[in-house]
Amino acid sequence: MWRSIISFLFFSVALCQPFLFQKRSSNISDFISFNASLPNVTIFAMGGTIAGYASSSTETVDYAAGSVGIATLVDAVPAIKNFSNIRGVQVTNVGSEELTPANVLNLTQLILAEVAKPDVHGIVVTHGTDSLEETAMFLDMTVNTTKPIVVVGAMRPSTAISADGPMNLLNAVVVAASNRSIGRGTMILLNDRIGSAFYTTKTNGNMLDTFKSYEAGFLGMILDQRPHFFYSPATPTGKVHFDVSNTTELPAVEILYGYQGLNPNLAKAAVDLGAKGLVLAGMGAASWTDPGNEVIDGLISNQSIPVVYSHRTMDGFSDYYYNGIPSYFQNPQKARYMLMLSINAGYSIQNITDIFSLEY
Ligand code: GLU
């Protein structure tokens, strides 16, 4: 009762000020529909194919990602208004390959402020799929909340026949607005499936069913705008939290790829170029070559550079490797953000090893 009254007053005031919000920033639109009985969901829009535009409805490859604004995306799915009140915030509008750690840090700080508002039930982030899992993992490690955070994308541009974005967006809002979604960390939603940000990865560059979590499985699915979760809320083993509320810049961490005859000195070059840590996308479970390991050992012992051994295979478990830090289940792109956050927190190589090994 009191919650409804307070939320009515709050959002009525907000609704009376659309012009004010527009004047303050053309990127921000306030709750565009309001019904006191519905939960409030904030959508942060980053761009990607879900906001992609092509001049032909049959074009699904050659299109401009990050072209359509959040208000247009929401307008295209009127059913959203049956599930929640929406506030849309356009943070960036680019292909996700253009996003930087600074963009992701900025998004995180916006979300931290948003989830602190008592009347916000959940968060949706619209995002390009190419680096979606990186942002989702970062949010999972930095936004310490039981409120649902759902990162959503699309594989077909908004102008395509059978565009998947509108249904994905509707489903993401449904999940963010549902009480069943509380306490499940950051989730990734595409193609009617709900995955944990900790485990889900993009597995195919073109197909609609690209996001998978083969080993850990999905958290749930959506049918007729009803989220069905397979298990009660749980936290992934080894999930850590990092406080970035006062962080202004993240340390540089580079990823090196493993292959037959790899150049051992690329690791040194990366450090000379400013890397404060390295992640290796090793062969198999994390193999690096003998000459490569020699260089890595030197960087660890002489320059105290933390080096995480991960795997170029999609799944697998990287155990102890030489003097490096095993990534355990984390793929290189997720391990990179974990290492950046660990270095940012001032942790020693031993501390970082302990953090990664929490997964095991
Ligand atoms: N490369 C673009 C991006 O990641 C388009 C891919 C997509 O969103 O599916 O934003």
From Swiss-Prot:
It comes from the Eukaryota. Residues 1-16 form the signal peptide. Residues 39-359 form the Asparaginase/glutaminase domain. InterPro entries: AsnASE_II, Asp/glu_Ase-like_sf, Asparaginase/glutaminase-like, Asparaginase_C, L-asparaginase_C, L-asparaginase_N, L-asparaginase_N_sf. NCBIfam families: asnASE_II (TIGR00520). Its main location: secreted. This is Probable L-asparaginase 1. Belongs to the asparaginase 1 family. The active site is at T49. It is found in: Secreted, Cell wall.
